[in-house]
């Protein structure tokens, strides 16, 4: 399916629902209508949230990523921060559609992307922790939703010039206080009652005079005291912690729980019918123990409380008349008191939160509003609550149409494009039907409540039938404009309004009572007399000295005034919309009920929204991102374009066969009238991408082969060089090892040779040599002393002392004899020598 319904072709209700279904089945729960986000409740946790996705959507513009609440929150926050424009985020949808979760996601995103710092973090934590407190006191399990908000909430978050949160203000609308005393089968009362009973320890329960079993309380539906997947005890502790973080003191938390317990105990006060002495019906309390416990806990006079529940004081001029109440009236008074106490407690909690998160005066600030309010409701039995809820949605639809058209018109004006009048359904006639100050339904309701005489829902309906009998958007059983006499779906006590989202039949029963919302003054004064500080402060009008005879405004008037203030607030801000839809009534993941979604789409006016958005130009985008996406369609702009963005866009669109009526060039944006044109551009882009992909593949494959060859060649050369080098290294290593071995051997041999004489093994030779040298020396010295005469004829010679000298001794004797002969010859004269020579010759 398409991500933006503006681009849906063909545009009709069936194709719109089919597109939502296709996306839902693929777990794409968000879809755009321009800058509107449609959110489908997935009834499961999807992996599309958290810091990673927040960082992703923070860095991209609205249409660059898939549709997401984060994208809308980012646009709102950046517009507030950078453009100094106050923002509001309107979250609408029926119960169970995921409005509360959507508001949490918006707040968590803003908290994550805004500034840091101890003070800023404290403010962010207080803003975030307000949610569990308001959910506990304002949410309940209904047939459609286990955590349904039973009140409307508008929060203004205020920021400084840097975009850091300073605080905020919360406004609540139309708490469903009737739930306090009665719930439908399969539903629960407000969460806080069950959380208190399940999470409070024994000591606290004893102090509050409560029992743990929810079945013991008339105001609680004991059949569904627990909800699957909801831990009331854990949630109670979370609520206490949240209140502490916000700034509630321990004493304030205790007082809030005591008033909450008071509501439960009031429901257990049983009233029985009695008769006075004159025979008129009266009423009284059956069991005084409950009243006694309430009196002790709240500091009340139990007798006065019992009297206030069973009688009523009326002032006529200067006289006071006490009227006894029958049992039905007394039960009504008891329930009215319980509803008023809880409603005022809820208002007090909201005001107390506002005191903690409010911003000091004098600071310049920017504001982001978040509105989480009921969506359009059509139930089997529609009463006063549905009437005011649908009135509020009519006003919101009016705001949406007017602001959307205004925004379109302003954008066209900024871009210098002629504005074309848009045909759309103006629901102002329906708003006037309801809110007109003199002739509106609410005005008639107030008039009927205030007029003297017999007043009933029937007389109110008769007045409406008379006044609006010819109104095109009003129908009833007796009006003739639509001939509804034979319509069995409408009772005699009903009227029907043709809202923008469809026809709704309202039963006027209890319209008067709910609009009056009266609390007898006796009960108000009794509560004011309480010694309990919080309960006392909830009933300032109970002070007899300050009591005003002026009747308080009716519930309808209060709501109308609140809506008027809200509308004024919304008109002053730049709107952002989140439309929440629930895909099925069973709260099952993956299940899509087309009929249910179609009804909600009508209530939310989705088709009307798309048509308004498409009335002029269906698509618009700044020149730069448009050129970045489509520049590949023109040879002039691909692969590089160095000129102006608008000129580049004109080159791209000029190269395509497009009608000039389909295009409009604004100052900063290109406008395309028909989705078909955009789809044509996308198709051309897809084909061009295929061509470029083929080209890229071809170039890449050639490059890959060349690169592979070069790598193989380099590898072969490297391997060869390595092999040869390694071979030489091994050869050199062997030679070097051999040389080192020989050197080591020679050096060792020389060392051993040099040091051999010092070894023990050479001691014998050394000693033998020494002895031999000693006897040789002695032999030679003795021979020197005993030499024979030098006469030649003397042949005497000393004998050798040892046999080892025999040879040496003979040699010495021979040498000595030759020496003597030489010495004798040297003494002869030459004549004697000649004579001797001749004798020898003879």
Swiss-Prot record:
ATP-binding as a keyword of this entry, yes or no, is: yes
- What does the entry's PTM section describe? Phosphorylated by ALPK1.
What InterPro entries does the entry give?
A: IQ_motif_EF-hand-BS (IPR000048), Kinesin_motor_dom_sf (IPR036961), Myosin_head_motor_dom-like (IPR001609), MYSc_Myo1 (IPR036072), P-loop_NTPase (IPR027417)
Q: Which SUPFAM superfamilies match?
A: P-loop containing nucleoside triphosphate hydrolases (SSF52540)
Record domain Myosin motor: where: 1-686
One GO MF term on file is: microfilament motor activity
* GO cellular component, as recorded: actin cytoskeleton; apical plasma membrane; basal plasma membrane; basolateral plasma membrane; brush border; cell leading edge; cortical actin cytoskeleton; cytoplasm
Q: List residues of the IQ domain.
A: 689-712, 713-733, 735-764
What residues does ATP bind to? 93-100
Region annotated Actin-binding, chain positions? 563-585
User: Which superkingdom does the taxonomy of this entry point to?
Assistant: Eukaryota
Q: Write out the GO biological process terms.
A: actin filament organization; actin filament-based movement; cell projection organization; endocytosis; microvillar actin bundle assembly; microvillus assembly; regulation of protein localization; sensory perception of sound
Instruction: Identify the SMART domains for this entry.
Output: IQ, MYSc
Keywords for this entry? Answer: Actin-binding, ATP-binding, Calmodulin-binding, Motor protein, Myosin, Nucleotide-binding, Phosphoprotein, Repeat
Q: Give TM segment ranges.
A: none
Pfam families in the record: IQ, Myosin_head
* Function (record text): Involved in directing the movement of organelles along actin filaments.
PANTHER family to which the protein is assigned, alphabetical: MYOSIN, UNCONVENTIONAL MYOSIN-IA
State the similarity comment.
Belongs to the TRAFAC class myosin-kinesin ATPase superfamily. Myosin family.
Supply the name of the protein.
Answer: Unconventional myosin-Ia
Instruction: Give the organism the record lists.
Output: Rattus norvegicus (Rat)
Q: Gene symbol?
A: Myo1a
